[in-house]
Structure formats: C-alpha cells, structure tokens
A protein has these predicted regions:
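Conserved helix/coil segment N-terminal to the catalytic DExD/H
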Residues: 41, 89-132, 140-146
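Conserved strand-helix element at the start of the C-terminal RecA-like helicase core
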Residues: 58-68, 225-233
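Post-DEXD/H (motif II) to motif III coupling segment of the RecA-like Helicase ATP-binding lobe
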Residues: 126-127, 131-196, 215
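Conserved interdomain hinge at the start of the Helicase C-terminal
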Residues: 206-233
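Walker A/P-loop
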Residues: 30-49, 60-62, 171
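Conserved helix-turn-beta segment of the N-terminal RecA-like "Helicase ATP-binding" lobe
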Residues: 69-92, 96-103, 182-187
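Conserved pre-motif I regulatory segment
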Residues: 1-38
Length: 233
C-alpha cells in the first residue's frame, strides 16, 4: 500500500493537505520531524499513515486521556488496529492490552508519558518492533509552554533505550520560537525536518458589535453559551 492509497482507503481523501506529505515522507525515510500545524490541519495523519506503512508498532505519546480515547475509537472505526495505555485502564485491562500488543494485534498504541518509565512497559518495548515514536502536544516538554509536563523530559532517554532508535515525530499547534527550540533540543531530535504551516483559520474571525440593546445581546450570549455547554462544544 502506498501513502496515497492509505489516505484514500482510510481517510477518504485524494490529496494531502499542506505540509502533511513532507512530514510523512520524512518519517517513512527514517528522518525525525518537527511539525507545527494549527488544530484541525491534520497532524494525526502525519504519523498515522506512516504507522500503517511501517512494519512495526507506532507509539504515540499523548498527555490527555480523553484525546487518546477519542483517537483510538476513531481509528478502530476506520479499521485501523489501535489501543491506548493510560491511567483509565485497570491493571488487568493494561496487562491484556500488552498481551495483545505482543501478539501483533495493534499498529498504533497511544501511551501516557508517565507509562514509558514503568517496568512492564519497558519489558514490552524491549521485545517489540517499534517503528516510530510520535510525540503529540510536543510543547509540553518546554518550561516556556503553558502545559509543561515534566514526564515529557524522559522521552529522549526512552527512545535511546529501544533496541533500535526509530524516527521521532514531534507535533504541536502551539510553539513560540523559544518553545520550538526547546522541543528540538529536549527531545534530542536528530537533523529533523522542520515544518510550520500557516495559522489562518478561515472558520474563525473577530467581529465587533455595537448592539442597540446591550442587555438583550448579553442575555443572548449567555443563552448561546448554555446551549454549547449542553452539547459539550
């Protein structure tokens, strides 16, 4: 299967969006990558398609339990074998997931950064064929970032401990120059492809209104907010 066939088969698209193909090509060639792309630009495709084409397992380091669950649910619905390993699993569920991973049942495994240091997971990766490590929300490694997670600092040592160093892809929608430099340095990226796409979101805009009845406008805004909260937007 080619990357284009994977895009069409699993995602239903005929062409890649801006920046995706370059990152995919870099990771497939064994090169590290640092991609700064806005939310909704398709960052996940940049590591999910290589995961489908590479022979082994792709590990996706993610800081958010809810995001892992949503991503895995979506992948399974698409027919892509995936799982997550985080604190929401019971110990029995965790062991079962590792057993299935050892049996080659998954192509993509989402994992919390804290899990990388556990003895059971370390034993698993020593036996497994890890083809790619994708670091989602990579800005969490930087103390300059608003979501600093100390556990992200252990990712480079984890990667180096693998029997064979796989390519590492770092992905974020939030990166000032200082944060970008930290991601590169602290993740120990090796000659990475660095790509930053535009941040223009056509569906977002600013509007200044001057309502004649400010009280009515405020009540309308409160009602809209209440509706959004009810539907979890």
């Amino acid at each position: 299967m080619t990357k284009e066939e994977a895009l069409k088969t699993y995602y239903g698209y005929d062409v890649f969006r801006g920046g995706q193909e370059a990152v995919i090509d870099a990771l497939l060639s064994g090169r590290d990558a640092l991609a700064i792309m806005p939310t909704g630009a398709g960052k996940s495709v940049c590591y999910q398609i290589p995961a489908l084409l590479l022979s082994g397992i792709t590990l996706v380091v993610s800081p958010l339990v809810s995001l892992m669950r949503d991503q895995v649910t979506q992948l399974v619905q698409m027919g892509i074998p995936a799982a997550f390993l985080n604190s929401s699993l019971t110990f029995r569920q965790y062991l079962l997931a590792l057993d299935r991973a050892r049996a080659g049942r998954y192509k993509i495994i989402y994992v919390a950064p804290e899990r990388l240091e556990t003895e059971g997971f370390q034993a698993f990766v020593r036996e497994a064929d890890i083809s790619l490590v994708a670091v989602d929300e990579a800005h969490c490694i930087s103390q300059w970032g608003q979501d600093f997670r100390p556990s992200y600092l252990n990712i480079p040592a984890f990667v180096e401990s693998l029997p064979h160093r796989p390519p590492v892809g770092a992905f974020t929608a939030t990166a000032t120059p200082d944060v970008k430099a930290d991601i590169h340095r602290l993740l120990d990226l090796q000659d990475p492809l660095e790509l930053t796409t535009g941040f223009d979101r056509e569906n977002l805009y600013f509007e200044v209104q001057q309502p004649a009845d400010k009280r009515a406008a405020l009540l309308e805004l409160v009602n809209i907010q209440d509706i959004l909260e009810r539907v979890n937007v």
